[in-house]
Amino acid sequence: MAGHSKWANIKHKKAAADAKRGKVWTRLIKEIQVAARMGGGDIDSNPRLRLAVEKAYDANMPKDNVNRAIQRGVGGVDGASYEEIRYEGYGIGGAAVIVDTMTDNRTRTVAEVRHAFSKNGGNMGTDGSVSFMFDHVGQFLFAPGTAEDKLMEAALEAGADDVVTNDDGSIEVLCPPNDFPKVKSALEAAGFKAELAEVTMKPQTEVEFTGEDAVKMQKLLDALENLDDVQEVYTNAAIADE
């Protein structure tokens, strides 16, 4: 990725998430509840739930919290009922932004998302206004220095679609979302532990941001990320390291 370091961006993202662990847990609990409600409470037959539970354990969430969230999802414990809503919009210079939320009050959520956009130089779009610029994929990112040939062989055998070496030396493995659990297990069995592993919306092309525009765009993304109902924020903005 010319002009910016994907590896540095990922490390920044991980550090920011670690700094907001309380919020991370809240997001994961919502994801576990919704995954269990939609696909049942058995992680062996519910790939989405299995991924959410793995993320929860990676974030050091206690097993009791995980089990309670699963029970709420399948109806065994009273609790708020969340629905998933996606919003699309534009950031600085028309950069594409997707905001995935889980909410028990869609009126509150849309107002908060719209306010975050408008206050920070962006604006809400309509359904489908920017999502066509992204691909829904499973993504794994490995540190610079990872054995590329061995990783590529293991990834392609596991069913990955593509293996990409970035300019900074980091390596990305991409796969269909439904194959994500299978590919993840196969890579780990081959001795490869990704620094980042997620099902994501990957931009087809990225727009480079530097200087003041980069600061403004990051401020908008942070404002959206900090909303309680927001689960994920995706953008095609590549914000250069200062």
Curated annotation (Swiss-Prot):
Keywords from the UniProt entry: Cytoplasm, DNA-binding, Transcription, Transcription regulation
Gene3D superfamilies according to UniProt: 1.10.10.200, 3.30.70.980
The protein, known as: Probable transcriptional regulatory protein Bphyt_1301
PANTHER family: TRANSCRIPTIONAL REGULATORY PROTEIN YEBC-RELATED, TRANSLATIONAL ACTIVATOR OF CYTOCHROME C OXIDASE 1
GO MF entries: DNA binding
HAMAP family in UniProt: Transcrip_reg_TACO1
Subcellular location: Cytoplasm
Family: Belongs to the TACO1 family.
Any single GO BP term: regulation of DNA-templated transcription
